[in-house]
């Protein structure tokens, strides 16, 4: 990896993750110069020369999504006009990923629109953590690496000397649950929460598919938003005989705060990655634990710069378990 020809930037909302990545790579983190004008418009640029350099931007289009998206687009445009050789975005959270299809007539496909905007701005490659729907990769005409956070999160359970069942919170997450179960051990069973959606951000839990009686349960999801559905699922698992219940997710949005989890007696812990900066919440709440993506993402950056396979990182991880 030619560090002299590589430069890493952090968008304002991902500074902690970006610094951790740079610490892993033993590289300097460069900040983005941002100006907010009186009318609300923004200007973002680099103080560093980027001409003929491979640029990596650590970003997240989490809340406030629209502001963070616009910041990223403007900064990418500035780098393109400054003659950067390549512009690679490490997008820890892909906003609008849940708007990946027309659920009803006259609705937009915002996930596709965002993909178009990122490409027009000038991005060469995107590395994204756990897309809500892997098919979103098909919205791009540039290389996309969809990093599976299960490999990072599973380490929290491979080191524990206890038996547990991996639980998918719905039928759509069965593959995600199966992948995590197989990463941990071939002996780990899975169960599925049977539920139906009754309105936006609201679902009704019908029951559990699989035996959870007298088992520790680990509910695995990609996104935790309001938290109501997850808490309901935990309550159903407890009624069906589950012992300790852990919640594991790639992205902790927590749009209604964390009290709903901290106050839920049926939930023992909530583990999320730092794809979204929740460190202040973790200082306040005992049940919240954050796992850093930095060790894994730093290896991804190194593989890209050395023209090596990103898939090999997964293989080496499994070999080192």
UniProtKB/Swiss-Prot annotation:
Superkingdom of origin: Bacteria
EC number from the UniProt entry: 2.7.6.1
Record has Disulfide bond as a keyword: no
Listed cofactors: Mg(2+)
Catalysed conversion reaction: D-ribose 5-phosphate + ATP = 5-phospho-alpha-D-ribose 1-diphosphate + AMP + H(+)
Subunit organization: Homohexamer.
PANTHER family referenced in this protein's UniProt entry, alphabetically: RIBOSE-PHOSPHATE DIPHOSPHOKINASE FAMILY MEMBER, RIBOSE-PHOSPHATE PYROPHOSPHOKINASE 1, CHLOROPLASTIC
Record's protein name: Ribose-phosphate pyrophosphokinase
Organism encoding this protein: Mycoplasmopsis pulmonis (strain UAB CTIP) (Mycoplasma pulmonis)
């Amino acid at each position: 990896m030619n560090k002299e020809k590589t430069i890493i930037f952090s968008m304002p909302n991902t500074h902690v993750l970006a610094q951790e990545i740079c610490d892993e790579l033993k590289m300097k983190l460069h900040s983005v110069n941002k100006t907010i004008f009186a009318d609300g418009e923004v200007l973002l640029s680099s103080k560093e020369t980027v001409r003929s350099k491979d640029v990596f931007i650590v970003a997240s289009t989490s809340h406030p999504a629209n502001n963070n998206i616009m910041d990223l687009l403007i900064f990418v445009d500035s780098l393109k006009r400054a003659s950067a050789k390549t512009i690679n975005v490490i997008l820890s959270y892909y906003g609008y990923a849940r708007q990946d299809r027309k659920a009803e007539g006259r609705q937009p496909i915002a996930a596709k629109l965002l993909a178009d905007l990122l490409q027009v701005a000038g991005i060469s490659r995107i590395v994204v953590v756990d897309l809500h729907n892997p098919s979103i990769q098909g919205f791009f005409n540039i290389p996309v690496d969809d990093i599976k956070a299960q490999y990072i999160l599973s380490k929290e359970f491979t080191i524990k000397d206890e038996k547990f069942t991996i639980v998918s919170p719905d039928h759509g997450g069965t593959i995600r649950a199966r992948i995590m179960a197989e990463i941990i051990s071939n002996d780990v069973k899975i169960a599925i929460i049977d539920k139906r959606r009754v309105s936006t951000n609201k679902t009704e839990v019908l029951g559990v598919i699989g035996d959870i009686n007298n088992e520790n349960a680990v509910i695995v999801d990609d996104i935790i938003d309001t938290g109501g559905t997850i808490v309901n699922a935990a309550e159903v698992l407890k009624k069906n005989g589950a012992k300790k219940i852990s919640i594991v997710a790639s992205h902790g949005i927590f749009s209604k705060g964390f009290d709903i989890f901290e106050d839920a007696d049926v939930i023992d812990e909530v583990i999320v990655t730092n794809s979204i900066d929740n460190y202040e919440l973790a200082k306040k709440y005992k049940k919240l634990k954050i796992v850093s993506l930095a060790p894994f993402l730093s290896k991804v950056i190194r593989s890209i710069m050395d023209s090596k396979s990103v898939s090999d990182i997964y293989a080496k991880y499994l070999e080192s378990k």
